[in-house]
Amino acid sequence: MAKLHDYYKSSVVAELTKEFSYSSVMQVPRVEKITLNMGVGEAINDKKLLENAAADMAIISGQKPLITKARKSVAGFKIREGYPIGCKVTLRGERMWEFLERLVSIALPRVRDFRGVSAKSFDGRGNYSMGVREQIIFPEIDYDKVDRVRGLDITITTSANTDAEGRALLAAFNFPFRK
């Protein structure tokens, strides 16, 4: 079991129950899933770019990504409905906890000029979204084998009802919010 999951069960549940005065431990917010998304618009011209992006995402997440396709045609972007334009991975369970642990303790501190992540990126229902500009902040990615620096979107879906509860949950995991 991941250290962060143990920590959640042993300390965070008690902290949040006390802070928000929940009547049951089932009311305590928990991390339900983490979704990683990488849009590769340039894949229209070069299919190899999408394959490389999917390979990078598989290394980062530990599971095979789903290739996303365009939902509708957009003439301005020269894409047609059904064209492969990105990839995504949904992490749950043990892999989710391990990824969250690596993100907070290893990957985010490796970002250049890092001052913390914005505390305003909550969606109103306790879910947090953030973007990473370079996939090379993850230690699994070999810098010499990267063909192009790509960013990815990370969405952390929680069972929290409000942004305050979601922020308290992520802050309990030492999520580096900007002061």
From Swiss-Prot:
Name of the protein in question: Large ribosomal subunit protein uL5
Subunit structure: Part of the 50S ribosomal subunit; part of the 5S rRNA/L5/L18/L25 subcomplex. Contacts the 5S rRNA and the P site tRNA. Forms a bridge to the 30S subunit in the 70S ribosome.
Family the UniProt entry places it in: Belongs to the universal ribosomal protein uL5 family.
Entries under InterPro entries matching the protein: Ribosomal_uL5, Ribosomal_uL5_bac-type, Ribosomal_uL5_C, Ribosomal_uL5_CS, Ribosomal_uL5_dom_sf, Ribosomal_uL5_N
GO biological-process terms attached to the record: translation
Higher taxonomy: Bacteria, Pseudomonadati, Pseudomonadota, Gammaproteobacteria, Vibrionales
Alphabetical UniProt keywords: Ribonucleoprotein, Ribosomal protein, RNA-binding, rRNA-binding, tRNA-binding
The organism of origin for this protein: Aliivibrio salmonicida (strain LFI1238) (Vibrio salmonicida (strain LFI1238))
A molecular function (GO) term: tRNA binding
One family name in Pfam for this protein: Ribosomal_L5
Function: This is one of the proteins that bind and probably mediate the attachment of the 5S RNA into the large ribosomal subunit, where it forms part of the central protuberance. In the 70S ribosome it contacts protein S13 of the 30S subunit (bridge B1b), connecting the 2 subunits; this bridge is implicated in subunit movement. Contacts the P site tRNA; the 5S rRNA and some of its associated proteins might help stabilize positioning of ribosome-bound tRNAs.
